[in-house]
Amino acid sequence: MPAIAIVGAQWGDEGKGKATDLLGGRVDYVVKPNGGNNAGHTVVVNGEKFELKLLPAGILSPNAVPVIGNGVVVNLEALFEEIDGLESRGHSCEHLKISANAHLVAPYHQTMDKVTERFLGQRAIGTTGRGIGPTYMDKVARLGIRVQDIFDESILRQKIEGALRQKNELLVKLYNRRAVTVDEIAEYFLGYADRLRPMVVDSVNLLNDALDEGKVVLMEGGQATYLDVDHGTYPFVTSSNPTAGGAAVGAGIGPTRFSRTIGIVKAYTTRVGAGPFPTELFDEMGEQLRTTGGEFGVNTGRPRRTGWYDAVMAHYAARINGFTDYFLTKLDVLTGIEKIPVCVAYEVDGVRHDRMPMTQTEFHHAKPVYELFDGWTEDISGARAFTDLPLNAQHYVEALEKLSGCRISAIGVGPGRDQVVQVRDLIQD
């Protein structure tokens, strides 16, 4: 059975955890291929809310093996806090597997992240301050520390020493902070070695063997398309590639092994942090979407910026990722709105653009061109078939499907794991 990828189509917080949880009972492996504990997702099981960051949502599916892939950057302190939190609520994490090649977030990465943001002032990106960007920087600069390194103290110390030559120069001379010692960082990592060891695997062979055996492997992407370092709203992006191509790299699975690539997209749009946002709302309607949709960061509690659905972005995301299906989430949040605007094009300096502008400068100046759709007042939280939805809700979904260039195969109508309208099967056609 080929692999399946789940990818955010906007700026994150689209409901990827809900999609993973929906499919979790039917897959054998759930893989987190990228990111770190900088992005969270919420899953509701039997009315109980779980907020996950490093752990894949598949950790809550007893029949699926959760895997943290080689493309993830792992904060060990945060990882074990999350594990302990789940286990205290009766959910075992003994089946968790972690790639030996995943990179580790060191305490100095978090320090660098925070002081750099302060140093940038008004030009700050708006990171979570959890050290994700600096960890990826070290990975690319070949100064990183990987999971496998903490099981050999001599190698670990050599790598820490190499990294600190650069870090201490910056911390002391540029940021006026104290120097970090090899001993304190080594002690930090070694303190987790014994507990971590049973979880560590060769994830590439594990997952490819599973595919060879006909197992279903689900990639649960973090962040989203427009936070991708190559395809997102640069420089207001993350440090990895949370697109479908990045999922393949972050799990060590070849692109030809994917049968479905599912884009997760909200029925409206949200964003956290700085950066352009053409459909952003600054009025009472923006606050209504934020309040009704519970649009506050899982990690930071920061209120999310809110706006209308952007079909231009959705169409471009479908192209970048090669989406086979869209999973439309939070349609219920729009209930009660008389007229629902959808962005169908942009106007930049008086010129209409039906596609994404080529440059970020143009996108930053883009003004949305809206088409209005009639809303509905009926409660849709109990809908389970497409025909259960009010006609105006059906028309809205059909319009988004046409404008976004990708079929909508599932629709979220509430926070519960079962509050989904499945138009077609997401694993098998």
UniProtKB/Swiss-Prot annotation:
Catalytic activity: IMP + L-aspartate + GTP = N(6)-(1,2-dicarboxyethyl)-AMP + GDP + phosphate + 2 H(+)
Database matches in SUPFAM superfamilies: P-loop containing nucleoside triphosphate hydrolases (SSF52540)
CC annotations in GO: cytoplasm
BP term (GO), one: IMP metabolic process
Keyword flag Metal-binding: yes
Swiss-Prot/TrEMBL cofactor(s): Mg(2+)
Binding site for substrate: 298-304
EC number(s) reported in the record: 6.3.4.4
Residues the entry annotates as binding GTP: 12-18, 40-42, 304, 330-332, 412-414
Major localization class: cytoplasm
Similarity section: Belongs to the adenylosuccinate synthetase family.
Assembly and interaction partners: Homodimer.
Task performed by this protein: Plays an important role in the de novo pathway of purine nucleotide biosynthesis. Catalyzes the first committed step in the biosynthesis of AMP from IMP.
Protein known as: Adenylosuccinate synthetase
Organism: Micrococcus luteus (strain ATCC 4698 / DSM 20030 / JCM 1464 / CCM 169 / CCUG 5858 / IAM 1056 / NBRC 3333 / NCIMB 9278 / NCTC 2665 / VKM Ac-2230) (Micrococcus lysodeikticus)
